[in-house]
Amino acid sequence: MFRYLLCSFGLVLMYPTGIDMYLVGLPQIASQLGASEAQLHIAFSVYLAGMATTMLFAGSLADRIGRKPITLFGALLFALASYFAAGSQTSDLFLIARFAQGIGAGCCYVVAFAILRDVLDDKRRAKVLSMVNGVTCIIPVIAPVIGHLIMLKFPWPSLFYTMAAMGLLVFALCLLVLRETHSKAAFHTQALPGVQRESFKQGFFISRLVITTLGVTTILSYVNVSPMLIMGQMGFDRGQYSNTMAMMALVSMLASFSTPFLLNRFKEKSLILFSQGLFVAAALVFILTQLGGVSHSFNLLGFAFVCSGFSIGFGVTMSQALSPFVARAGVASSLLGIAQVCTSALYIWVMGLLEVSAINILLLILSVGALVSITLMLAVPKMSEMVVNEQIPESA
């Protein structure tokens, strides 16, 4: 079991590392490539675009040819793309390399969830996904620090050489340690009458897809508007802003690592509803600060509610979303990832076009997201027949 957890953690961590590690070198990258920092900020969107475009075919291929080949392809592509990004001489070549990096990270991210679906039952999967979420929260704090330390001695290409080394390490892990988890799944699914109901149109899957998508949109909206709220509205400087974000990452980690213990005492439904209640509490805090009822410093409490609400609910809801699928777990994971990435990007883009204020962007998704999610949780309970599909392949 340890081999699957180790490889899955490595596969998942490539995605946030590709986002956060290079940011510290952005001014130097822009200077050497003859582009403005604003122009190179599109590298973030290009990376996510690479992830989104590859997610569907990666999941489908993983269901057809197995998990391991896709992980090897994704990790190797991530390493090669990182190497070429380090050697880029123009901004166009740099953006192409970033897109390829996103493709590699997307393959690994999708298959990691499919592997966990293959080898873990419902209860253990919910716990592990919560821990994965907790580890992921560490990267936005650690990656820029590591990047800063690297750049004290070496130029900016060393950041991408480091990412290339990480890709090769994950490739070696998957090649030497990971065993195929999907090879015998087809044999089992033929004997399961529930497989005929592995439809992505079923209400249960759609409801959990919507809930996880709204959750990801909420947390990314918080990350997107946090500079305006913390440095603009609250008057913090950059150092205080960094400390605040690090503190909120710590809150997320503690909430994520506490969730497995909470699952021993409470039902999954109760935890998901509690997480939505934290979103509602965050919205109320922000409303009070905007009305002048309390100091803007209380926004920090709202941020803590947002981070802990997402951390407690996301892993559990993702586990439920994957539960009905044995033969099509890869595609299910792909659909979840695509919905989360695309909806988040679309929401933030539309709010920007409409010139909605930072606090209202966050308030809107908190309020609407919590209302919709609570309604879906109460209206679409966990299916009893899902127990049939909760078997795992013998190869795991």
Curated annotation (Swiss-Prot):
Record's keyword terms, sorted: Cell inner membrane, Cell membrane, Membrane, Transmembrane, Transmembrane helix, Transport
Membrane topology: Multi-pass membrane protein
Domain of life of the source: Bacteria
Keyword Transmembrane helix: yes
SUPFAM superfamilies named among the record's database cross-references: MFS general substrate transporter
Residue intervals passing through the bilayer: 5-25, 42-62, 69-89, 93-113, 132-152, 158-178, 210-230, 243-263, 271-291, 298-318, 334-354, 361-381
GO MF, one annotated term: transmembrane transporter activity
CDD domains listed in its UniProt record: MFS_MdfA_MDR_like (cd17320)
Periplasmic side: 26-41, 90-92, 153-157, 231-242, 292-297, 355-360
PROSITE patterns, sorted: MFS
Protein name in UniProt: Multidrug resistance protein MdtL
Lineage: Bacteria, Pseudomonadati, Pseudomonadota, Gammaproteobacteria, Alteromonadales
